[in-house]
Amino acid sequence: MEDKANGMYKARNIRGFCHLSNGQEAANVGLIDSISSRDVICDSYRMHGIAFLRGKYVRSILGELCGRSSGSSRGKGGSMNFYSKDNLYGGYGIVGSQVPIATGVAFAMKYREDNHISYPDANDERRIAIGMYGDGAANQGQIYESFNMAKFWNLPMLFLCENNLYGMGTSVERASADARFYMRCHYIPGLRVNGQDLVSVLCGTRFAADYVRSGQGPFLLEYYTYRFLGHSMSDPGLR
């Protein structure tokens, strides 16, 4: 699907922003297979694979990229702003903005449960929220604010950093004093897994999701992965 989008962009059937995730397939598949369909995902702008795995048809994804009404967001969102009623609350184009939104979703989940507005029965797992962000967004202040709020209220929140080693064209070593993103919050437990290995992603994500779902509070998970293409289709020579 990403290769098709690549070709359609070069043929000028797709305009504007387009961020492909070639190389990060194991991370996407492992995540979706490790969580419940009732869990809420707030993703960044590199999210075509997540949209597909959350139930969107290839036709609706490519339609969205082409700005057609058959697209998943009626053609108005484009590459960076997918949405699905199946607990996929975007794609967000503003770097890091999805993390406080996911934290707010986690707060709502806990508030409703604590006040018996929506309480899981014996056969129903507790829901969690997943806030996905990249290494380029990891230095955003709003993410640290979200860390604090999530731990202060012990929210059912999984912070998920997809570290593909480059924020646009800048390597993490040239932008971060400490590139161990899973250790960024000393009061939230963290784990790094090999994002290129499906089994590693499955084991690590299931462990993290079970921790959050058990009511112990937030967890910080890092996928150490790599994208095979440039930051976006606007990167010359990297397509």
Question: What function would you assign to each model-found segment?
Answer:
Residues Y211-R239:
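Glycine/aspartate-rich loop-and-adjacent alpha/beta segment that forms the canonical ThDP
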Residues G49, L165-M168, R227-L229:
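Short gly/pro/ser/thr-enriched loop/turn and capping motifs at secondary-structure boundaries
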Residues L198-S200, G204-V212:
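Phosphate/diphosphate-binding loops
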Residues G134, C161-E162, L221:
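Active-site flanking residues adjacent to catalytic metal/cofactor-binding acidic residues
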Residues L155, I188, G217:
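Short glycine/serine/threonine/alanine-rich loop segments
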Residues P189-V193:
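Structural signal for short hydrophobic segments within the conserved structured cores
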Residues D3-N6, A11-W153, S171-D178, Y182-Y187:
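Cofactor-binding active-site loop characterized by glycine-rich and histidine/acidic residues
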Residues W153-E173:
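A short, conserved beta-to-alpha structural element at the edge of catalytic cores
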